[in-house]
C-alpha cells in the first residue's frame, strides 16, 4: 500500500515538473519520465490521452483533464474516432504546426511532428485576437502559464506559446521528434508487393521516422518551398524594413510602470515620429512595444534614416543586397534600436540590456517586408502507384502575415482548424475532388478574416468552419475547378516556385473594341453641336469645342456653349479642362494652349484623358430639357464616382493659403470662427482661417468677454451637438486617447497590433531604378522641340510622359516627384496643401512648417548623451555610428544597372524559399569582423538563464499552483492557498507588480467564463483579480479620467507601493527613477483649505460647486474635478505620465496624523504603518497591544490600513431603505475641502497578500454574507457584548470593512475621541440624515470584527425627466445606437438626493469598480481560523462568482437597459436583493461594457487604417509598374527608340518589338489602351481607399474632440478663465464642423454604395482578380 502511494506521489512530482518545464528539451524529458513512471508508450498508441488520464489521478491533473475533456467531447471529433486510420506528418513545431497537431490528435489520427531544432528560442511577442485567447484557455493554457493573457493583455511570446502547445500536444499522444530535418517526400516504389506508400526523407537518415508511411503531409515550417507544387501570389508594397529588438525584463517596479505602446495610426497623428526624428535623427514609420518575458520592440524604419545613422553602409536597389550582413553595421543597428526604444518609452526603462538570440548574439534583427506571398491553394493531392497523399500548408507557408496587422497567429489557428476539418473529410472517405473543393472554398475566406467578421460565439468554435465563419458557402468552389490540384504524375506538374501574375490580360480584340467604343461614345454625345465633328483623338479636339460639348451634354449648367467661339480655341480648351477638374475630379493632362495645337502623336494624351471621362459618365443619361439646373446637379451627384467625390473633398480643403506669421496663427487659433465645408484638415491647418484672417479674437462671433454670455453660448451649442449626435451619427464613439508626452498611444487591449505602415516612404525608393536611370539620361536639354509645359516636370525639370503625369494647381509632374517640401514624403492629389506665394506643396501635417526657421533635417542629429548606467556601451555605439558615416554612400545609377542577372536570380530564389524572418535568422552573423567564423547555437537553457533569469523563479513558484481549479480537491486547494499565503506573509514571495499593473478589466469576461466552467477560481486567477487593483490602472481604459487631476493620488500611491514591497526583496526590485518620488511640498495641503480655516465657508463653496454644474453634469454624464489638483501637480504628472494612475487617493484617515497641520505630511507615509501592521500581527495577533504613543499610532494605522472598500450589497433594511453598491461614496477630506474617495487598497505585505485569496470574486450578496456569519455562531459571543461597539462605529467613514484585531475593537470609542469633534459631527450628520449605518455582526470570536458600512449613495434620483437625462448622458459620448425604452420599471425606482446621485456619477464614470476587494478576506486574515472556515469562504467565493458569471452578455450588450439586463439576470441573483440593488450593479456593468466596446471600436479603427494603408502601398507599386510599361509604349509610338536599348534588362510585358518603328502600329495602340484601362481602374480604387481614409480621420478627430470637451466640461464654468471658456467654444465649434463633414461624407458614400450595387460590373470582383481586397472592416 505504501509503495503504491509512493509511486503515485512520484508521478505527481513528475507531472508538476512537466507542467513547469520552461524549455523544449526539459518538457520532452519530463514527459518521457512521466510516461515511464506510468508504464505508457506514447509512440503510436491509440487513444493515448484516455489511457494517460485513467492512470494519473492527481488533483492538479484533473483540472487539466476537465479542460481537455470539454474540448474532446465536441461532436466533430466523434470521440476520437474520426481519423483513427490516418497517419499525418507535420513539418515544423511552430505555433501553427503544433495547433494543427492538437486538432488532429483530438480527431484520433496518428500524428508525427518533426522539428529541425530542439529549442524554442524566439523571444518575439505575438498579438492575439479574442478568439485565440479563448481557444488557448480552452486547451488549459493557464494551467501551464498562470499569467496567460491576464485581464486585457492580448499578447504572448512565441517561446511561451510554443511551450504551452507542445505540452498539450504531448498529452494528446502526438509524437514529437526534435533534431530531425525534413528533406523531401519519397514516392511509393514501383514494386508494390509490400504495398509501400508515401514516406519522408529525413536527416539523420537512420531515424525511425523515415520508415513510417503517411496519408497526410502538412507543411508548417514557414518556408515557401518545403512542399513543391504550390503557386504563390505576390503582394508587393513599398520598401518596408522592420527591426525587432528584445531587451531583458527584470520585472522591477520601474519597469512595471512603463506603458506599453500598442500602435499609433498614421492617419491620425505624426507628432511623435517628428519629435523622434528631431531629437535623435531616427525616422520611423511605426513602433510597437509589448512587455512580456522580454521588453519587445518592433518598428519600421525608413531607409534614408538607416543610411544617415550608419546602420546600412551602402544604398542598393535590391533589398536583398541592401540588408545583407555585409552591408549592415551591427553595432550601429544595436544603437539605433536602443535609442528608438529609449525615446519611445520616455526614457523610463532603467536598463536596456539586450536579450540574446539562439546564436548568443544581441537579439536585434532587420527584415524586409516589402513583398508578402500567399499560396494560391491550400492543399493538393498526389497519387502514385495507387497511393494518394494529401498535401497541405498552414502558417506562414500558406499565408504570410503583415506583422503590424497582428493577424499571424489568429489566421494561422483558423487555417489549422480548417486543415483538420479537411483531414477529417479525408479520413471519412470523401473523394479527393470533394475534399479539395471544400478546402479551397474555405480558404477563400482566410485572407479576409478580421476580429470583427468571425463568429462571436467563441466557446462554440470547432474544426467545422461553419462554427467560425458566418454565412460560409462550403460549395463556393466546385470539383471541376480543383481538378488541376490532383497530381497523378502523368500531366505537367506546376512549377516549383511559380509566382502567378495577379492581373488578367485584355485580348487584342477586346482592346480594339473598347478603343472603338470610346470614339463612338464621344461622337454620340457631341452630335448636333455646331462646329463639332469628332473623327479621331487629335485634330477633332483642337478647338476645344468638342470637350466643352461633351461636358455640356451631361451638365449644361456648367458651360454656356453658345458663347464659345471656334477662334478662341485656347480659351475653350482651358475652360473644358478646368470644369472637368473642378466638377469631375479629372486632372488635366495638358494645357488649353497645348490642346489647340494637338498633333498626331498626342492622341495618347487624349485617349488617356477621355477614357477617364468615359468611365465617369458612361452610366449617366444626359438630362432632359425640362429639368432645372438644380435637378441636373442632383441627378449627377447621385452618380458621382469615387474620383469626383474625392475631388470634391479635396476642393473643400482650402489649399491655396497665403502664409502668415506664426504669432498671427497662434492668435487666430483662439477665436477661430466655424467652418462648415472643410473636409480633412489636420490640427496645424485648423489653426488657419479661410478668410477674415486679420480679425482679432475679440471680434470673433461667440467670443464675448462676459462669462455669463459665454456660458449660455456653450450650453446652447452643447445642446445642438447633443441633438445632432442622437439624430445623425451612425457610428459609435470611442474611448479617449490617453496622451503621453509625445504621442497618442493606444494602450491596453490591443487589437492587434494596430500600427501605421509605410507612411510616406523615402523618395529614393518611390522612383524605380530604371526610371531614375532613364531620367538621368533624358535631361532637359535633350527634350524634343515640340515639348510643351505639360511635358516638363515642375519639380525635377525632366520629361514627364503621359502615363506617369499628374497635375495640381496648374503644375505637371511625375507621380514620384510630388513630395512634401518639408519632409520629402510622397503626397497624393487629394491630400496636399499649396503655398501659392512660394509655389511649394506640403503634406497636410507640415503646412504650418513652411516658414519655420529650423531647416529641414538632412543629416543625422548628434548622438544623445548616454545614461550613466550604460555609459561605456552607449559611447562605443555612438562612436561607431559616427565613424561609419564616412562610409555611407548612395549607389549611382551605373552601379544599379551593372548588377548581374545572377545576383538578381539568387536573390529572387532566396526570397521564394523563405519568409523574411527565416532568411534573417538563417543568415545571421555576429559581426562583419567574424563573418568567416562558424556560428554555434546556444543551448536553450543558457538562453533562458540570460533572458529570463529575473522572472523564472517567480514564474515557477506561481505555476506550481497553476492548475488548482478542481472542485473535486477543494480541501487540498484551500490547504495549498493557506500555505502559500503564509509564505507570502513571511516575505518569501514579492508582489508581482508587473502583473498588477498590466491586468485590466478587459479580460473579466473570459475569467468569468472559465470560472463558471470549473466551479472554482484558481489561485492564479485570484492573484490576477488582485492585480487589477485600481491603484495602478484606474484610468488605463476608463475614457473619462483627466490625467492631470490624478497626480496627487498617483504620488501617494507610488510611495505606498514602493515602500510596501516586502523587506526581503532584492535591491533590483526597488529601482525607481528619482522623479517618481514626490516632494514634501507636493504632499502638504494648502493652508487655506485646512480644517481650521472656516469649515462653514468651505461647505458653502462645495454646495455651490455642485448646484452650479448640476445641469451639464447630468446631461453629459460629467462631474467636476478639483481645480486645485490640476495646476498644482502638473509637473509631477508630466514626469510620471506613463504610470498607471488611480482615481483613489492613498490618503488614510489617520486621526492622529490629522490632529495638526504640521503632521499632514505623514498622510502618505506608509512605512510606519507597514511596520505597525507587521509588528502587531506577528507579536500579538489576538490580544491588545498597549504601549506608548508610537504604538498607539500604529494601532490606529492598523485600523485604517485594513480598511477595504467593498462593492457587495448588504441586506436591505426592512424599513424600505434602498440598497445600492459600496465603493461609490467618499468622505470629505478635511485637508482639501473637496470630495476625495476613501482609501481603499491594502498595500502592506501582510494584508496585500492575504487579500488575494478571494479578491477575484464578485460582490457578495447580502444573504450570503449573513449565511456566512451564521455558520460561525457557535464561536461568536453574545451579540449584546458588541452592542456598544457597534453603536460607536457610526463615527467611521461609510463603505468600509474594518478588521480590528482582538481587544482593539474595544478601543474604538477611544480612537473616535481623537478626531476633531467638529469633523466627526459633520461627517456623522452628513451620512446619518439619509440612512443609518448598517453593521453586520462580527464573524469570528477572538479574531477580527468585520464592520460593514452601508453605502448611502443613490444611483438614481427621482427626476420625472430622468429617462431623458439618462439618454442624453449616454448618447453624447457613448456608442450612438438607438436606446431601448423598456426600462420604465427601473426608472421608477429612482430616489431623491441630488448630491448623492452626482457622487454616484463621479465614481461610476471616473473609476472602474473594485470588484475583487471582498469581505471574505477575513477568514484568510485570522491566524487561528480553522480549515473549515477557509473552506466555507472558498465556497462563498465560488457561489458568488457563479451567480454573476452565468450571464456573459453583460459585457456584450452595451446598449441594453438596466431593466432588460435585470430580466436576464439569474434567478438566484434576483432573489438575493432588491430590484434597485441589482439595477445598481447592472448599471455599472453596462458602463464597463460600454467603455470596453468603445476601446474595441478604437482598435478596430486602427486595424482598418492599417489595411487601407497597406492597400494604398500596393496600388502605388502597381501604378509605378504601369507607368514603366506606359512610358515604354509611348516612346515606341513616338518613335523615340533610344529607350529600347535597355529593354534587355527590364521586365516590360506585352510590348511587341516588331512594331517599334511604326507610330501607328495597332499592336502598340492595343497595348496602350490596355494600360490606360488598368490605370483607370487603379485610380478609381485608390480614390475609394482615400475616401475611407478620410472618413477614418474625421471619425478619430471627432473622438479626440469629444474627449477634450468631456475633460473641460467636467470643471464648473465659474472656475474657468476667459481663455478656457473661449477654448471650450472653439472645441464645440470644431466638433460641429467635423460632425457636419462626416455626415456629408457618409451620405455621399451611401449614395455611391447604392449606385455601385446596381452597376453591372462589380469593381470588387475586378480588383480581387488583380490581387487586391476591398475588405477593410
From Swiss-Prot:
Transmembrane segments: none
Location of the LIM zinc-binding domain: 791-853
Ranges of Low complexity composition bias in the record: 882-892, 1081-1094
Compositionally skewed regions (Acidic residues) per UniProt: 993-1002, 1010-1041
A molecular function (GO) term: oxidoreductase activity, acting on paired donors, with incorporation or reduction of molecular oxygen, NAD(P)H as one donor, and incorporation of one atom of oxygen
Known EC number: 1.14.13.225
Recorded coiled-coil stretches: 1475-1531, 1573-1638
Domain bMERB per the UniProt entry, residue ranges: 1495-1661
Gene3D superfamilies, A to Z: Calponin-like domain, Cysteine Rich Protein, FAD/NAD(P)-binding domain
A cellular component term, taken from the record's GO annotations: cytoskeleton
A single GO BP: cytoskeleton organization
Binding residues for FAD: 96-124, 396
Keywords: Actin-binding, Coiled coil, Cytoplasm, Cytoskeleton, Exocytosis, FAD, Flavoprotein, LIM domain, Metal-binding, Monooxygenase, NADP, Nucleus, Oxidoreductase, Zinc
Enzyme class name: oxidoreductase
Required co-factors: FAD
Domain of life: Eukaryota
Catalytically driven reaction(s): L-methionyl-[F-actin] + NADPH + O2 + H(+) = L-methionyl-(R)-S-oxide-[F-actin] + NADP(+) + H2O
SUPFAM superfamilies, sorted: Calponin-homology domain, CH-domain, FAD/NAD(P)-binding domain, Glucocorticoid receptor-like (DNA-binding domain)
Annotated Basic and acidic residues bias: 661-671, 973-992
Comp. bias (Polar residues): 1159-1182
Region spans: Monooxygenase domain: 2-492
Disordered as annotated region, ranges: 647-714, 882-901, 918-938, 951-1100, 1159-1188, 1357-1393
Compartments reported by the entry: Cytoplasm; Cytoplasm, Cytoskeleton; Nucleus
UniProt function note: Monooxygenase that promotes depolymerization of F-actin by mediating oxidation of specific methionine residues on actin. Acts by modifying actin subunits through the addition of oxygen to form methionine-sulfoxide, leading to promote actin filament severing and prevent repolymerization. Involved in exocytic vesicles tethering and fusion: the monooxygenase activity is required for this process.
Protein family (similarity comment): Belongs to the Mical family.
Protein name (database record): Protein-methionine sulfoxide oxidase mical3b
Classification of source organism: Eukaryota, Metazoa, Chordata, Craniata, Vertebrata
